[in-house]
């Protein structure tokens, strides 16, 4: 079986090591309202369309309780819309600083293309946000063949529509000839819902949530323990394979191409 296309996520997978661009902004918009949320809470819905991410945060029991304590009522859809507008304003100002390709990505993409494999992409960012990220990433040497944002389809992750749109534009079918690579739970669900081979990447991921310096300085045993937690989350969410870095992807694809069975 031949893999004909790989569909990459963006932040935390191919650019923005650790997926830090949106994290601080999510925390800030709640802090501005007197509601403190943790980095772990802020990361939990990562990969969703960003307004859905804000909405998911307001639906978390602890955050809802804290909001009610501060405001005397539960958060409303109007609150979600107001926070999202603030989120966008702040994020747009910092996005250009968070589009650096993660180590190994450009080399792997070059190799995949040499094997005749097309490169697509999906994201939780809007089209307007991706205009910034994609432009900056291209200037630094990374540009997929196609990009789909949640704006382009009826719904973002975990729905499979962005992957289907990639398949149509790249002219690849059936879906078992495509691989989805991402760094969040919603990426894994997106890939599986689309009927694709699905691969989670640990280092640089939002799920791991560490900077490169933190990874380099962390005690090896402690790092391995944290990586194992992420590995299990990916597998439980549907990943067929989990890799530590992008450099392992070609080997995984070679292994997949030797398989004769149809994924389910």
Swiss-Prot record:
It catalyses: phosphonoacetaldehyde + H2O = acetaldehyde + phosphate + H(+). Signal peptide: none annotated. Mg(2+) binds at residues 9, 11, 183. GO terms for biological process: DNA repair; organic phosphonate catabolic process. The keyword Magnesium applies. One of its GO terms (cellular component) is cytosol. The keyword Metal-binding applies. Its EC number is 3.11.1.1. GO terms for molecular function: magnesium ion binding; phosphoglycolate phosphatase activity; phosphonoacetaldehyde hydrolase activity. The active site is at 9 (nucleophile), 50 (schiff-base intermediate with substrate). Keywords: Hydrolase, Magnesium, Metal-binding, Schiff base. Binds 1 Mg(2+) ion per subunit. Its cofactor is Mg(2+). HAMAP family: PhnX. Homodimer. NCBIfam families: HAD-SF-IA-v1 (TIGR01549), phosphonatase (TIGR01422). Involved in phosphonate degradation. Belongs to the HAD-like hydrolase superfamily. PhnX family. This is Phosphonoacetaldehyde hydrolase. The gene is phnX.
């Amino acid at each position: 079986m031949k893999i004909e296309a790989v569909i990459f996520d963006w932040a935390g997978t191919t650019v923005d090591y650790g997926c830090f661009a949106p994290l601080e902004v999510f925390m800030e918009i709640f802090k501005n309202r007197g509601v403190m949320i943790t980095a772990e809470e802020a990361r939990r819905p990562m990969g969703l369309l960003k307004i859905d991410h804000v909405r998911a945060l307001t639906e978390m029991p602890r955050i809802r309780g804290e909001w009610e304590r501060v405001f005397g009522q539960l958060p409303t859809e109007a609150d979600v819309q107001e926070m999202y507008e603030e989120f966008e304003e702040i994020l747009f100002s910092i996005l250009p600083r968070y589009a650096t390709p993660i180590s190994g990505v450009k080399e792997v993409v070059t190799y995949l293309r040499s094997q005749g494999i097309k490169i697509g992409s999906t994201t939780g960012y809007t089209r307007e946000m991706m205009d910034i990220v994609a432009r900056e990433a291209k200037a630094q040497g990374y540009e997929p063949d196609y990009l789909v944002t949640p704006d382009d389809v009826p719904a973002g992750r975990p729905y499979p529509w962005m992957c289907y749109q990639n398949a149509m534009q790249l002219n690849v079918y059936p879906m078992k000839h495509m691989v989805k690579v991402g760094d969040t739970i919603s990426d894994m669900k997106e890939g599986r819902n689309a009927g694709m081979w699905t691969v989670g990447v640990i280092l640089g991921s939002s799920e791991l949530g560490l900077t490169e310096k933190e990874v380099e300085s962390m005690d090896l045993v402690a790092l391995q323990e944290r990586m194992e937690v992420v590995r299990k989350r990916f597998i439980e969410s549907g990943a067929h394979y989990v890799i530590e870095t992008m450099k392992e992807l070609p080997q995984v694809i070679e292994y997949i191409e030797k398989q004769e069975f149809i994924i389910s």
